Amino acid sequence: MFINHLHNTDIILASGSPRRKQLLEDAGINFRIHTKNVEENYPVYLQRSEIPLYLSKIKAHAVKADFPDSLIIAADTIVVQRRDVFNKPGSAEEAKDMLRKLSNNMHEVITGVTICYGEKERSFYDITEVFFKPLSETYINYYIENHKPFDKAGAYGIQEWLGMVGIKKIQGDFYNVMGLPVSKLIDELEKMFNPELELNQINSNRPEEPNKYLYFGI
């Protein structure tokens, strides 16, 4: 079973996020943390789903350079509302502005993940739609003053107070909003350690060929 391979593999989480650390621990994966300071800039022509993929690859490759024989897991999360991309707020005012825009609206949370292991590399992303109720200025100010969400894309954590009282519904993976789509990550790790699994999946999704020997008579 591929889980046994994971227990015998040096796994590095290339992220300092406490949420990603918690999620990997809860998934039963043994790992250590190593981060590198990288410029989180991206080309302006990238599509929104490509942005976190691009940044996760930069993070993964930076750590892989120091630990070429380890399995590296890197991730990046952005919040998107129409044409606006929300990263981590740099100030309380910026956080307030983000939450005012998210209030009574739907936005998408997109997490890109890159896994590197030797010559193998896999990248994927997941999208979750989040619907906020109307957020009063009192709620916004209270949350920012007490929870200081300056390390979170979109200026909120779904697992925190504002997520509990302010989110009306979500469509997609809850853990993706926390910063790591664990179910997809496990699937991709299993494919990495068991290539036949991916081949079987491709074959099972392939449409059936038409019957070459089916004839219609008149």
UniProtKB/Swiss-Prot annotation:
Catalysed reactions, semicolon-separated: dTTP + H2O = dTMP + diphosphate + H(+); UTP + H2O = UMP + diphosphate + H(+)
UniProt xrefs under Gene3D superfamilies: 3.90.950.10
Catalytic residues (UniProt): 76 (proton acceptor)
Keyword annotations from UniProtKB, A to Z: Cytoplasm, Hydrolase, Nucleotide metabolism
GO molecular function, one term: UTP diphosphatase activity
Domain of life: Bacteria
Entry cofactors: a divalent metal cation
Top enzyme category: hydrolase
Family, as annotated: Belongs to the Maf family. YhdE subfamily.
NCBIfam families xrefs: maf
Protein name (database record): dTTP/UTP pyrophosphatase
